[in-house]
Amino acid sequence: MSSMKWLSATAVFAAVLPSVSGFCFPESKELNFSRTGTSSSTTFTETIGENGTEYIVSGNSSFTNFTNIPVKKPTTDDSSTSTPTTSSAVDPTEKIVRASSSSSPNSGDTSATPDPKGGGAFYNEHSGILSFMARSGVEGSLTLSNIKMTGDGGAIYSQGELLFTDLTGLTIQGNLSQLSGGGIFGGSTISFSGINQATFSSNTAEVVPEETTPNPNPGTQTTTSQPSPTSKVQSLFTYSSSTQANGNGADSQTPSHKPGSGGAIYATGDLTISDSQEIVFSVNKASKDGGAIFAEKNVSFENITTLKVQNNGAEEKGGGIYASGDLSIQSSKQSLFNSNTSKQGGGALYIEGNVDFKDLEEIRIKYNKSGTFETKKVTLSLPEAQTNKSSVTAASQSGPNTTPTPTPPVTAKGGGLYTEKNLSISNITGIIEITNNKATDVGGGAYVKGTLTCKDSHRLQFQKNSSEKKGGGLYTEDTITLSNLTGKTLFQENTAKEEGGGLYIQGDDKTLTMTGLDSFCLIDNTSATHGGGAYVTKEISQTYTSDVEEFPGITPVHGETIISGNKATGGSGGGVCTKHLVLSNLQTISISENFASENGGGACTCPDNFPAPTASTPSTNQTAAPKDDKDFLIDYVVSTTIDKNKATKKGAGVYAKKAKLSRIDELNISDNAAQETGGGFCCTESLELDTIASLSVTKNLAGKEGGGLHAKTLNISNLKSGLSFSNNTANSSSTGVATTATTSQSPTVSSFLPRATAGSSPAPAQTTPTYAGVVGGAIYGETVSFSKCSGLCQFTENSAIDNTPSSPSLNVQGGAIYAKTSLSIEAEDPSTSYVFSKNSVSTGKAQTTGQIAGGAIYSPSVTLNCQTVFSGNSASMATTNPPSGTSPKDTIGGAIAGTTISLSKTSHFSENTADLGAAIGTLSGGSSSNLTEKITLSNGSFTFEKNKANKRGVIYAPSVSIKGNNITFNQNTSTHDGSAIYFTKDATIESLGSVLFTGNNVTAEQASSTATGGQTTNTTNYGAAIFGDPGTQTTDTTLKLIASSGNITFSNNSQNTATNNPATKFCSISGYVKLTLQAAQGKTISFFDSIRTSTKKTGQAQNSYETLDINKTENSNTYAGTVLFSSELHEVKSYVPQNVVLHNGTLVLKKNAELHVVSFEQKEGSKLIMEPGAVLSNQNIANGALAINGLTIDLSSLGAPQTGEVFSPPELRIVATTSNSGGGGGVGGYVTASKNLSAASPTVAATNPTMADNKVFLTGALTLIDPDGNFYQNPILGTDLTDVPLIKLPTTANQVDVSNLTLSGDLSPKKGYTGTWTLNPDPQTGKVVANWKFDMYRRWEYIPRDNHFYANSILGSQNSMIVVKQGLINNMLHNARFDDAAYNNFWVSGVGTFLSQQGTPLSEEFSYYSRGTSVAIDAKPRPDFILGAAFSKMVGRTKAIKKVHNYSHKGSEYSYQASVYGGKFLYFLLNKQHGWALPFLLQGVVSYGHIKHDTTTLYPSIHEKNKGDWEDLGWLVDLRVSMDVKEPSKRSSKRVALYGELEYSSIRQKSFTEIDYDPRRFDDCAYRNLSIPMGCYFEGAIMSYDILMYNKLSLAYMPSIYRNNPVCKYWVLSSNETSKVVCGVPTRTSARAEYSTQLYLGPFWTLYGNYTIDVGMYTLAQMTSCGARMIF
């Protein structure tokens, strides 16, 4: 390196300033004078070594105001030659040096332009290192300013490595190069380190185009040019710098790098800036690339406190930095790229390699622009040259052989950042902010051709960026991966003229993958086509994974997704547009307030209809998604909200193909609006909502179908806390454009949706799709199912409205749910309830010719296997009159409409409204001759209450099947008959519990119908709850009532126009109906209202009419129940034009009830019961017989007897047949009045009745019954009676046939007026009569009573006193406690006894038990004497059952006792001389008792009872003497003793009188007993842990030496009959065993207890007591 020659920086200035020309090549010399072009006073050291040159700066060193750019003066008009003017003052505005100047001058042409020369301050043309540093320990600053050169590096040029180290300040300002590197040009690496502050400002790299001077006389004029001083200097530089033989100096040939690039720095090698405080690049310009920095390799910033790259500009690429290699910013605090501009890409950064942001506090890329904008232009600061018009004209002219070069299309990608490869961001602790950048091409904020990876960082934000094409915030051509980001990852207020307002990913196989983000936000972004927030073709996914479970077994969730306020003004996907959106394991998801002018206001993910990007050809080889793959998936999220989104077409919230939302705690879909379908969701195939704790779908709106949810297949399952669909609306006109409703309750689509702007791209022309109508206010689907949901599931105030101003024709169906094919709701949890409330379908302005149906639900197939409530739902039509010639259809199904409808479990319908089927109605599914519509209610309880049908039927269908536990139709109303059920083919009602039709009302008196020929006829409304109408069919409808496990009842069903007045017409069933009645054994079908049926059959023959079978055996099921007609509530006259056959069971005609039939036949084994005034009659439409085989007359009600009658007898009536009768029955048939009865001649009995005859056939037993005993209380029976009428019969002889008639039943009453009946079998008066023989009057029915119970209760009283005595002997006395030192004691005991006595010849079986409490206190006046007193209370119960006579006794007892007890230890002296004595113990108890008894005796067979109250007084005396056989010793506590006892008890029962049934008076009686128990006992103590337990066991034989047999006399008050009852006393001998124990817990407390059992031959008594003793 010794041959190297170095040109010092001062050489440049020495050539210009002769005063310093002697110091051109200093070596290791301290220089202390000015080295600037103007003036400076600083210390500056230059050291030249073999490896390079080193400058040590002390203090402030500056090099300013120098240029080598020659200035050409313009020539005058009259001069033919031009002479340059030499000036020492350089004009920095001149631009006369061409970029294409020759590198070596032509010796023959003295006017040639000198070669470009740079490095005005420092110039190094060799490969050695050029370094600048501060003196150790001394601050040093370097300033290079206003140096403008024709060559590379305006201030510094170095072919070798360039180093800046440890400078306090470095200022490169206002410098210019007409090639590259306005401030610095480095031919190798450039490094800055340890700089406190470095400023690169207002530097420029500009390539000046070649200028041509015009020659006015080219043929004759010559130009003489003399070199200027500047030219001499350039020649000197060339010479001094070209001493090498090969001539490879930097200025000897055309440069290989990019001229016009690197406004501040141009580096052919790596550029590294590290370990510095503040680095600023500002207002630098480049006419090509890299407004501030251009690097042919890598650019690296490391450990920078503040980095600012701002207000720089490039005419082409990289307004701030252009790097052909990679860009790395690491370990720094603040990095700012602000207000930089470029015209062809990378407004701030244009990187051909990778970009790496790592370990930073914050990095901001703001207000940068890429492209040409009218608002601001790049201005270059260059030396100016005066140019005349002729020169411009000459420069613009080209030779004849010149071919214009076509201008390539200019792209301007990446308003803030452009990278040809990958962008990596990691460990940013503050913020990554890319805001307010613009690009006229793609990527307003950033353009990344490779992958973008951001991890372990805080706040990645793209805001207010804009693109004239795609990707307003971010545009990438490869996958984006975001992981472990904290704060908000934000894309906000970005705009794009094409797709992807927030971000855009190019390519069908690229994804946006996010893991572990705190918050991902797409907010207020806008695109002019698709994807307002984001456009990602393949997939967008966000999830959270964690290896740590805070709670075992529970996967943690974290993070949120917010997609809000985004707009796609000319396409789909206002929030996001992607083929797959997957969000899982998150805390919160919010998709809100987004807008799309086509589909998917919040998200568009439908792969089949996925919108292709602008100017792109859809791929023809895309891989089809798997059939089970979900293109929209939200899983395992705490809270999800999809609200306030809007779409001009479909799916305001989400537009997808297959969507699934699962395992969500709270899901809210609300306030979304779409002009066509799916306000909340629109899925072309399926939508699944699974395992959601709380689901709310509210206030969504669609113009046609599915205000809330729209899907081909919709499955909702496993909801844990129910769901809520409320205030969702489908509201539109027939053209598909929403109109404004006339009321505030009917919102329209247009009021919610913004209009597309004028600049929006027009939507492609499409054909109007075919819609089912305005359907599905909350839900639309082809197949809809709900399963395994729990809690309360609500559908409230959803609606479908057609607001067409006039002549609408759309169907309006399914206010809450519309299922095109089927709807299924299943619930396994019995507490689950589905509530449909105030849902509606309607026309808002005009009546429609379409079908309005299903206020809450519409589907051809409806299956509800759950508990449901339908309340306040309606299907209604506008009240305006329709245009002439139109025929609006009746509205159907206020709650449910469909073809086949099946309900099970429990359903409640209330206050629903429609024309037909106020609650449930069916729509035609076939021809009128083959009706397939059917309503089935089964296996549950069903209630229909206060529903209103504007025409007919709470239930309306051709076929109805009801089979349930409890079925109620209550207070429903209709205009015409059929207020509860209207059917046209068949109906079956089977009760498994109770079926009740009550209080239903018909408001109109007449029903108008159109007959054949167009004539209108009126028929009478009877107020029928059930109405059958076959229409034009020739056969009657069929109605079958089956009371299988419960009763069926019709009551108070009426026709009443004025509801304020009481009704006068009541009817249960009407219409053209063939009726069948079946009641199981013990069950009843009750008609408290009339039946008024008609028939399509005609003719006068009985066999021309249908048969009404009552209790006919069917399918091996035998029916033997009751069918009842009753006029208890109001008049009941039933007309049934059928032949009635009573097969089994019972037919009851209550008092004054009438049944008119064609004929009546009673089969053997059945029973016909008629009460007084009842009428069974045939009708006048045909001849028909009444064949009665055993008639029962219920005499409970007397009816209205006439003179000579004991009661009003029932009537068997025959009426004459009219010649013109036929088919009328109850609807129009005339019924003759009852004929007057007159004498009739005897008739011959007919054994086989002919049912076609107009005759009464009466045979078998005539049974009189009086179940309540009322009839025989009639005083008229107090005398003998003859010819008492029992039955009214026809008076015409040939109309009566009586044979083998017998009288039976309650003929001999047991109480009341008793007597006997005899039958007069000859009905000679048109009646069946009988004679009555009076016997006597009895008030009560007699039943024998043996009455032992009252006497036996004495034994219970005795036992209650013995149990107290046993407690005192065995506990309180306890061998008189002579070994006990305690003197005063308080005792509390619980006592109980049980006495059982078997039945004996003298007594009945009975039992007695009692329980109570005893307290006692005693003292020991002397050690050998004890005295105490006790008080006891017992509560007992006595029970006895006499099975033979069917009566039972139940008695209660209250016993109160007072006792005195004592004990004395004595010695009986046997031998005084020897001192022999026999010790013995004397114990005694005296008790007095007062016992109260309260007893009830029940007589179930006669439904009677007695009550008796009495008192007992008792005494008990007991004396026990015991003598030790073995006494305790010091070694043993055992004692063996013999004892004898004297026990006397006396119980006296006081007199008393019974009340209620046949009372008796009982006299006093007493029971006395003296017994002498004799036996032995054994005692012993056990000691453990200072606790003493003393036990005693005694056994005794107990003979009774005296007793009496209690005898009680009584009188029967009603008859003065006297008798006596003897008490069944126990046997004389019995045995007794006793066990007692005492547990000494310490000196003051003792626990004790005893158990006694007495066993006799017929008796067993058990007695026990236990308690505690306190010593004081």
Curated annotation (Swiss-Prot):
Pfam families, alphabetized: Autotransporter, Chlam_PMP, ChlamPMP_M
Topology of the protein relative to the lipid bilayer: Peripheral membrane protein
Domain Autotransporter: 1379-1672
Coarse class of the protein's main subcellular location: secreted
Disordered, as annotated region: 69-122, 203-263, 384-415, 734-765
GO aspect biological process, one term: double-strand break repair via homologous recombination
Keywords for the protein's UniProt record, in alphabetical order: Cell outer membrane, Cell wall, Membrane, Secreted, Signal, Transmembrane, Transmembrane beta strand
UniProt keyword Membrane present: yes
Signal peptide: 1-14
Biased composition (Polar residues): 235-256, 384-399
Intracellular or extracellular location(s): Secreted, Cell wall; Cell outer membrane
GO cellular component: cell outer membrane; extracellular region
Entry annotated with the keyword Metal-binding: no
Low complexity bias spans: 77-88, 100-111, 203-234, 734-744
GO molecular function: ubiquitin binding
Family as reported in the entry's similarity comment: Belongs to the PMP outer membrane protein family.
Cited NCBIfam families: POMP_repeat (TIGR01376)
Listed name of the protein: Probable outer membrane protein PmpB
Organism: Chlamydia muridarum (strain MoPn / Nigg)
Upper classification of the organism: Bacteria, Pseudomonadati, Chlamydiota, Chlamydiia, Chlamydiales
